[in-house]
Regions:
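Internal, well-ordered domain-core segments that constitute the primary functional module
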Residues: 106, 112-219
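Terminal catalytic/cofactor-binding subdomain
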Residues: 1-118, 127, 149-162, 201, ...
Length: 493
């Protein structure tokens, strides 16, 4: 596919310093209710999308084309971006969601004692928070029917520029089967971490590239609730009624740096296309993908060596260069493709020269530098627990409190966006995907007097049980979605 949409789902953690304000589960409900009922940034679902995981009024679609909800598994906030074709639109839409959440904290007077984080691991409890990527692919195409495994080496090695960095590590071990009493009295994520497998700190690891590498158990898995994998194929047609589906990538992390975020999504989109186009050789395949995943993340020598299926030893940078070379076939097709290819090559060259000079572009480098500066000022070592707090505060999404945004304010982080871009994206959906049409329908229902009955989904909208609009094509902006209903709309003017 020469054109595709992509989107990112991010799960957020919440910390509450003042227990008198309530627990984190109560705080995220307050944030959600404030945004939908008071600020009216979207339409809250009055139906259950899932009786267990997304009951009625757990969230809904927003004016900017995205979706915000409280995931019942862990009771955490989750934000799914609008469908995007442009990397700039994607990063802006993602950051817009964060700004809306932060503004709610301030509106509610909670910002001093509550914080929201896009970190991907809990250092102490062993829980992880997902940052999942979605890419439009053909359900009957080459990727989903024979070449998906050729994408795995790319995903394993892209952490050299896509990783967000992590202080310390975890060791997993087999857990005991939970009792019926524990199943009934505890949330699913507690059962998952405490019983499906056990988690313990690994004191041998000072710092690593990835927050989630220690927790990945499979390369490809169709069922992922208790089976963390790199890729979830999503054998479904929810993205389109014309033979399209979504590729759901589970091994990823929430990038703070705009450049690193865009590079991760852009290179992955091109690598997917290369696999679809038959440009990737079986010579790229890894001998042990999960071993390589952890070894690369934990290699503090930055050699990042791994073994291929043919027995040869190559570096992660060399393997990334092979994917880059294959993707040069798409050079000249668009400004976006050319940016991706140019920056991909520049990043690999700079990583070969000196990774620690890339703190302006890569999250793991910036975080490591911040930790080292803190250690020098406090005269402590990597074993000090204070560094786990530094790690966490890097991912505070409030620009007024985040270590990352402090880094950015000092001019030490490369930006792709203006603050104005993020502000606009809080209310406006991307104009070249179906998110545009869906947002127009959200806007229309919000303006309507009374209390209409409605059901919104990614690809369809129903209002008053009589008006139904389909939005099957992700690449169609549906400039006039109300026309499908005829006149008058909803029976009012």
């Amino acid at each position: 596919m020469d054109k595709r949409v992509f989107g990112v789902e991010t799960e957020f953690g919440c910390l509450v310093a003042d227990e008198n304000l309530g627990n984190p589960e109560q705080i995220v409900e307050e944030i959600k209710d404030h945004l939908f009922y008071d600020k009216k940034i979207g339409l809250i679902d009055h139906h259950a999308r899932d009786d267990v995981f997304e009951p009625a009024e757990s969230g809904g679609f927003l004016l900017n084309g995205a979706r915000l909800y409280v995931d019942a598994v862990g009771s955490h906030l989750e934000y799914a971006t609008a469908e995007c074709q442009s990397l700039k639109d994607l990063v802006a839409n993602d950051r817009a969601g964060q700004r809306l959440i932060v503004q709610a904290l301030h509106d509610l007077g909670l910002a001093e004692d509550c914080a929201i984080y896009n970190n991907s691991v809990d250092h102490f409890g062993g829980h992880t928070f997902g940052c999942h990527e979605n890419y439009l692919v053909r359900a009957e195409g080459e990727l989903m029917n024979g070449t998906l495994h050729l994408l795995i080496p790319f995903l394993v090695t892209r952490q050299v520029y896509a990783g967000v960095g992590r202080v310390g590590g975890h060791v997993l071990f087999e857990g005991d089967a939970p009792t019926y009493e524990q199943l009934s009295q505890n949330p699913i994520d507690y059962i998952w971490v405490s019983h499906v497998y056990g988690v313990a700190p690994d004191p041998s690891v000072k710092f690593q590239l990835s927050q989630r590498a220690d927790h990945i158990l499979r390369t490809i898995a169709s069922k992922v609730r208790f089976n963390r994998a790199i890729v979830n194929p999503k054998w479904e047609t929810m993205y389109s009624q014309n033979g399209m589906t979504r590729l759901h990538l589970l091994f990823g992390e929430a990038n703070q740096n705009e450049y690193g975020y865009a590079l991760k999504i852009g290179t992955t989109a091109l690598a997917i296309r290369a696999c679809e186009s038959g440009l990737i050789s079986h010579d790229f395949l890894l001998a042990q993908p999960l071993v390589a995943l952890r070894d690369i993340s934990r290699d503090d020598s930055f050699q990042w060596l791994l073994e291929l299926q043919d027995g040869s030893i190559v570096s992660a940078l060399d393997l990334q260069s092979r994917y880059l070379e294959a993707c040069q076939a798409f050079k000249g097709e668009s400004d976006q493709n050319d940016w991706i290819l140019t920056e991909w090559e520049r990043t690999l060259n700079d990583l070969k020269a000196d990774p620690m000079q890339m703190g302006d572009r890569l999250d793991w480098v910036a975080k490591k530098l911040i930790c080292e500066e803190y250690m020098a000022s406090e005269q402590i070592g990597w074993e000090d627990d204070a560094l786990q707090s530094v790690d966490l505060e890097y991912h505070n999404i409030d620009p007024a409190a985040s270590l990352f945004y402090g880094w950015q304010e000092m001019g030490r982080s490369k930006r792709l966006l203006r603050d104005l871009d993020i502000m606009v994206a809080q209310a406006d959906a991307p104009k070249d995907t179906r998110a545009h049409g869906r947002s127009k329908l959200v806007e229309h229902v919000l303006k309507r007097k009374g209390a209409p009955i409605y059901t919104f989904d990614w690809s369809s909208v129903q209002v008053d049980r009589q008006r139904f609009t389909q939005l099957p094509e992700p690449l169609d902006p549906y400039a006039n979605p109300l026309d499908q209903w005829g006149q008058p709309i909803f029976g009012d003017k």
